[in-house]
A protein has these predicted regions:
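An alpha-helical, amphipathic repeat domain used for nucleic-acid recognition
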Residues: 1-192
Length: 192
């Protein structure tokens, strides 16, 4: 923390203090002070970007939005995102692949994976490639139905289980295939 004679207090990273050679009693011109403020803003945005990326998978757009939401100047946020991209710490394609892999591990359907990509603000240009690798979820659906229906199930339990699968992003046709494998398909089940 640096305190100026006029009472202004600035929280600076050690690197910024060293870059400007700050010490007690240093006289600064207005121009030097403005450069210090700009450098402090840049460093703040970069360090916050590093913390965000270390905590979760984010796209370029999502990182910039989060930096601005946390109080960073939009210019500093944009520069910090570009700095992270240049250092190959933010890669939208890699993030999209990680999101889809996480959805597969959780047993979500393609619709839920698309929703996750949208929520993370992944550009749509990457969606087709990463979703093309999505495996068939019929075995997962069958396993889910077997685990949640048990022996003494009725129409109400079947309806709940299929609704849960729909919420998890599986399509009617995929659920229909799972029901057919278990010989549980009823005439009431919709086509799509």
């Amino acid at each position: 923390m640096v305190r100026f004679d006029d009472g202004t207090v600035m929280r600076l990273y050690k690197q910024t203090v060293q870059d400007f050679g700050l010490y007690s009693g240093l006289e600064m011109t207005d121009e030097e002070f403005q450069k210090l403020c700009t450098a402090a803003g840049d460093m703040s945005a970069k360090m916050r970007a590093v913390r965000i990326v270390a905590a979760s998978n984010v796209s370029r757009q999502d990182l910039q939005r989060r930096l601005i939401h946390k109080g960073e100047d939009s210019t500093h946020a944009k520069d910090a995102v570009q700095w992270m991209v240049d250092m190959q710490l933010v890669d939208d394609r890699r993030t999209a692949e990680q999101i889809v892999q996480k959805c597969i591990q959780k047993g979500y359907g393609v619709s839920r994976a698309k929703q996750a990509l949208y929520e993370k603000r992944i550009p749509k240009e990457y969606w087709d490639d990463v979703l093309a690798q999505y495996p068939d979820q019929t075995d997962h659906i069958v396993s889910y139905l077997q685990n949640h229906l048990g022996d003494g199930w009725g129409e109400k339990e079947l309806h709940r289980a299929t609704d849960a699968l729909l919420c998890r992003g599986h399509s009617y046709s995929q659920i229909r295939q799972g029901l057919e494998q278990l010989s549980l398909l009823t005439e009431e089940f919709p086509e799509e």
